[in-house]
Amino acid sequence: GADATKKGYTEGNGYIVSWCVGHLVGLKFPNDYGNGWNQKWSFSQLPMIPDNWLFQITDSTKAQYNLLKNLMNKDEVTEIICATDADREGECIFRYVYNMARCRKPVKRLWVSSLEESAIRKALSNMKPMSAYDNLFNAGYARARADWLVGMNGSRLFSVRYGGKLNIGRVQTPTLAMIVQRDAEVNGFVKQKYFTADLNCGAFTLSSARIDDEKSADALVSACDGSTVTISSVKREVKTDKAPKLYDLTTLQREANKAFGYTAQQTLDYTQSLYEGKLVTYPRTDSQYLSDDMAQTALEVTKLCDSYFGFGIAHTPDIQKVINNSKVSGHHAIIPTSGIATADLSSLPTGEKNILTLIATKLICATAPAHKYDAVKLTGICNGTEFTATGRTVLDMGWKRFIRQTDKEKPDEKALPAVSEGQTFTVAASNGEHFTSPPKPYTEDTLLSAMERAGNEDYDDDTEKKGLGTPATRAATIESLVKNGYVERDGKQLRATDKGKELVTVVPDEVKSAKLTAEWESKLQQIEHGELPETVFMSGIQHFITDMCRKYGSVDKSVSLSDGGNEPVGKCPKCGADVVKGKFGWYCKGKCGMNIAKVYGVELSDTQVKGLFDGKSTSYTSKGKKTIVRPEIVENPYNGKMYYQWKTERGNKNG
């Protein structure tokens, strides 16, 4: 192989191997086009639709680009092998460099889903010419131009319209809109009390249907207490829970967030590291199945997982359950590789070890028998009213025997005793008080699910997804929302900031429509599969941008953007004036000097600061050490004046 290490590449055995560091070449920004686009933002510049798209070399990686250019154009190099990630972005990363370097040498494509030596050797013997992947590139290039057109035009259009800087994104804005809507549902929820009449039959309890009026519930309880209930129906049905599908990236990110609290980006990073370490297959996949040619490999790997992950349970894998060629377009589901047999798994970092365990467990579960149980529903009549109880008895644990604490499932219903129709019980009746449950704020788990389902409300689980973004880009979308200050993390929850709410409030529905963006994603998939010319898609995007600029190309003075969302977080404990968020933190509008910037170098979130002004403690972690912060108002012993401070485990931070 190419084992002679040089600066920026390796060489040997007739090969030169080098690499890209992300996107070495990308689309130029509007300011680089001239056309007046580099002037102060105005409606007259819009819409910005380049006649010829221009590319630029990324400054931070220019040296690596120049190296690749020189290597490609060396006289002794007769053929190029593209070995970037086998997906849209990988195709674009290579072709942008190849085209910018004006290289015209023949190219073959190395398409691999595993970095094991055996997989690479097999792929090397099955390479196709670059032209076989033109549709993949067309989809990636169309996606990049669509993002540019929506983002660059939308940001300038609505920033000028409302007189403040707004960042618009083709996927980012609809995702933010979903978070804002969920937060509004949570904040606007009014819990409602309801009741059930519960009949204690000794070994089990029968309950009435929901009763909204407490007096009616009390009357039913009084009528039934000490009375006899007669079992009118005993329904038993053997049911099965099918084994779960294998992981695609999104389901892996969701379950890792649920089990370990990992962000989508953390899970992608851990899985990418495992992939580069030859321990799992390609991570950025949207398939939950394997292809026919993977059957024998999957069987061998499943047996390895049984051995190396200490399940110790007899298991005959049914590999055919996870084989479906029609569900694998680019890459198959994520599974471990045979590399786990020789690797020192104990030396893996905790995050990677946890992710590998999830992936191995999923392969075991997916090839295991169904979980079977006997579902029972009892119905009883007391004083003319129907009461019910449900339970289940496990008949065969099946795949669930392999579930560990990483899959924090809800406990199954308890088994009910053997009861016959016509049997009677003397009961003690009580009034059960309940409350309706509020909608929950998004976590990365539930947001990823919502992004995946967006635009798919009328489709079943096995229909090809549209969704917001792709498995490869959803993590970056969430991170961008957080980085730009539109969303903040509050524990596992993702909450919209005032800045995020403001943006969603002012932009029109067509810009924040999840359905429209999902339809665009569906069209990109059609381009990738050769079912739609990319020119048709781009024409539609250009018409959308032109119409949007025409419709909203005027100043709207009815809306005034705040500077960072200046909604008061509380009253100043020193002078009583409003405390608001500014560019450098929170400050008192009464100018008494009270401010909150950072506590021990850590910037608190909007939610944490609001909590402090409500008298609540909050906590943060810095350099691995957790610190509790609580507000205090104390008297200065030297002048008798009251002042505000933070009381923490590591000392005081005066405000």
Predicted regions and their residues:
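Short, polar/flexible loop-turn hinges at active-site or ligand-entry regions and domain interfaces
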Residues: 53-56, 84, 104-108, 129-136, ...
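Metal- or metallocofactor-binding catalytic centers and their adjacent structured scaffolds
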Residues: 214-247, 253, 438, 515
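Basic, low-complexity terminal or inter-domain segments flanking catalytic cores
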Residues: 6, 72, 155, 188, ...
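C-terminal or mid-to-C-terminal helical accessory/interaction module adjacent to the motor/catalytic core
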Residues: 66, 75, 117-201, 236-240
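Intrinsically disordered, low-complexity regulatory segments
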Residues: 1-144, 148, 317, 410, ...
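Amphipathic alpha-helical transducer elements in NTP-driven molecular machines
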Residues: 14-17, 21, 58-69, 74, ...
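Conserved short loop/turn motifs at secondary-structure junctions
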Residues: 83-86, 163-165, 236-245, 254-260, ...
